UniProtKB/Swiss-Prot annotation:
It comes from Rattus norvegicus (Rat). SMART domains: PSI, Sema, TSP1. Keywords: Developmental protein, Differentiation, Disulfide bond, Glycoprotein, Membrane, Neurogenesis, Repeat, Signal, Transmembrane, Transmembrane helix. One of its GO terms (molecular function) is semaphorin receptor binding. One of its GO terms (cellular component) is plasma membrane. The chain crosses the membrane at residues 969-989. This is Semaphorin-5A. Residues 486-533 form the PSI domain. The keyword Metal-binding does not apply. Residues 1-22 form the signal peptide.
Amino acid sequence: MKGACILAWLFSSLGVWRLARPETQDPAKCQRAEHPVVSYKEIGPWLREFRAENAVDFSRLTFDPGQKELVVGARNYLFRLQLEDLSLIQAVQWECDEATKKACYSKGKSKEECQNYIRVLLVGGDRLFTCGTNAFTPVCTIRSLSNLTEIHDQISGMARCPYSPQHNSTALLTASGELYAATAMDFPGRDPAIYRSLGTLPPLRTAQYNSKWLNEPNFVSSYDIGNFTYFFFRENAVEHDCGKTVFSRAARVCKNDIGGRFLLEDTWTTFMKARLNCSRPGEVPFYYNELQSTFFLPELDLIYGIFTTNVNSIAASAVCVFNLSAISQAFNGPFKYQENSRSAWLPYPNPNPNFQCGTMDQGLYVNLTERNLQDAQKFILMHEVVQPVTTVPSFMEDNSRFSHVAVDVVQGRDTLVHIIYLATDYGTIKKVRAPLSQSSGSCLLEEIELFPERKSEPIRSLKILHSQSVLFVGLQEHVVKIPLKRCHFHQTRGACIGAQDPYCGWDAVMKKCTSLEESLSMTQWDQSVPTCPTRNLTVDGSFGPWSPWTPCTHTDGTAVGSCLCRSRSCDSPAPQCGGWQCEGPRMEITNCSRNGGWTPWTSWSPCSTTCGIGFQVRQRSCSNPTPRHGGRVCVGQNREERYCNEHLLCPPHVFWTGWGPWERCTAQCGGGIQARRRTCENGPDCAGCNVEYQPCNTNACPELKKTTPWTPWTPVNISDNGGHYEQRFRYTCKARLPDPNLLEVGRQRIEMRYCSSDGTSGCSTDGLSGDFLRAGRYSAHTVNGAWSAWTSWSQCSRDCSRGIRNRKRVCNNPEPKYGGMPCLGPSLEFQECNILPCPVDGVWSCWSSWSKCSATCGGGHYMRTRSCTNPAPAYGGDICLGLHTEEALCNTQTCPENWSEWSEWSVCDASGTQVRTRQCILLFPVGSQCSGNTTESRPCVFDSNFIPEVSVARSSSVEEKRCGEFNMFHMMAVGLSSSILGCLLTLLVYTYCQRYQQQSHDATVIHPVSPAALNSSITNHINKLDKYDSVEAIKAFNKNNLILEERNKYFNPHLTGKTYSNAYFTDLNNYDEY
């Protein structure tokens, strides 16, 4: 392109002029400390992910007892995954049926809500207890943990699983088989409860519709600790008088609680709750009131909790740590009690300090807990607040909300370090080191991004596996496995030590960053954790994306053309804090229009003729430049011609005449040569040859044969008797030759004859003695070689498993002499020997692992085995010595009683047998539990008055004979007795009628009106409870509308509440809030 493009106006219009140096940065901004961030691209090679088509909401994670599999609950699916790489072992689809979905739609719920969201996922022995919302009709199943399609039982999920997937809930399964669940018990979620079911103990729940027990709670977690079951939740604070405020709570119940008697029946008698405080200290403390998640470290009795501010306030989160002893101290302290709704909340002494779930040994309330039932009904809330271990939260962060927490205890070089993993609502995990002492603070070690840039979503679940140092994260569309030890990520000693990672240290021997377990020497392993790591804020500039192509103009001399231009900026990111500027063009120009231009003419080509008129050519092309993108093409011709040699006459034409005929062939057969010729006219200088040759008569000549005459007889040798031999020769030759004179001597023919010495018999001819080749020679003394006999076979090279032996012979019987033939064949032979395999002695394999104990109690046994296969004995080898099986006793403790009481004996059947039954009271029987029969039979036991039917049949004939013995005396006795009996009956009837008339007369007297129950059957029971509030008395007898028949695992529709129309008032005119 001629000239330069003038694009200054384009640069100014697109704003692409940038300074050569980075813009001035705020020094304070460049010096502030920020925590390291591990991007999704950096953490990607360490991650393992599992996804499944159509599966979402991976919100429930748990491990099998052997910690080899991860069990995952998602919407409409259950999965079993390998812990190593999250590969799929088994997938089970668990959807709602169409009828249930239609019923859900009819209640105004959306398609998203009317699905089966897994909300309970608990492992008990080799069984998996799982519950799902099932389109607002919760259902639970008990499955085999090794095969999720094998369903052992299916029961209602009411009171065990929430109806809505939006409701928070928690559940746990104790070792004895009881299920403790905290969830909403009805469709709209207005009846929250902490409920116990299954197992051997009676079902219990918190009081229904009583805000002092539970006030719109959001359940977070539950733990089985000692004699108690603890629940953690947040709820509207009933003791807060000024506005609506949410408090976090810790509640507990005794595991041996069986409810009250006459009061608090089917209701907890040991339920107590206390407030959890997590606040930032100051003149006016800043409270983090809403508990979001907890994590329990049983080895240290520590409970880590995540607390946040209210959703309507500024976003802020904190981590507070509570000691179990502090929680127990609050429950041992005084209660906070409100006499009535207009009274203040005041402390009240605890009637049972240091309560440890003791029970009554005797009396009417045997087996009930030591708490007084009236106290259990009134005193629920503790006065003292549970304070954290430290006055300042272990970790605080503004402008973010944490949703889940997991804690790992790591052995550093000098001390144990607690590492807290916090899940944020925007899809990252923050790794925090807890304070090392009361005076030190926490450190944010790093933040792990689980999604690519510009994408985020909340984390659904968080599970840590301490034995393998692995973190499992449940997200909306997949599950992620994150290794906690990523020491090899740091390549240098400075990066390893500067990361301040308690998992990692620099091994001076191996010269690399390793974990403590991987190090070769503790003394050579360097680590530093007291300080917090900071991120280098120096950022090198990087170009952002190119802008779209836009039209622009350019000038080329006097012509104006158009182009397409695009630009990019150094802002992704922009260089900061001394970072490098972007390298490369900030603008690209393409598709500029260009007018075509002619190239210079080429030189004239040589004349087309050397004499006479010819022409010459020259050319040019429109490629200087070539027209592009709408530019103008060149104007004019691209080729010119001119004449040449128009005055140079040509000389006479010199040329060859035509070829003459072929001459005679030089040979009649066997291949000859023939020639033809031409002459040059008008001169001697014609180009080329005047003679041309070709082969001829290439066919083979006929075969010629020629025999020489016999030579004269010549004597050969003389024998002992004076006779002698004579011989003569002749030769025969044949060949395909054109000339017979070219024949050469070929085969030799010899004849021999014997001539006697006396000449009487003349000479006799033996005929042909032999034919020899032309160069051959005949000798009567030639000796051909012959083999000697074979030697014996040599010793075998091996005693077994296939060896080799050989034998030899020599060509000396006789040796070849005077040109005789040598021996034919091998002089050495080989043969396989001892082909049978060698004997192999047996060797024991390693002992197998001990098998599972055959019984969980009462004495069982386990065993281990080994086999004689390493290798096995073979081919006569010795067998292994010793035992192939070892057994040992296990679980010798006495078994608890697992059977219910025997039922009453049944009525005798036709075969004279009675039957009684019993049932196993354990939901998950393991090993020898519930061993024995469920039925028992015995022969019927008859009393002395029972007469079998056979006896009656046999005595019928005797009775017929006795009927004839009835006489007159008998008739008189019967008549007298009947008269006396009639008189007595008449007297009784008269007396009854007189009393009835007296009562009717009394009924006509008018009495004052008093309230009476519509159903007076409970009046006596109400009178027994005069000392309690009457409303409470009605509540005690107004049974909960949800009562479980645990044996049959269904809800009894015939048990409904009773309603009374009258009101009962106490002397104090007290009312209890509902």
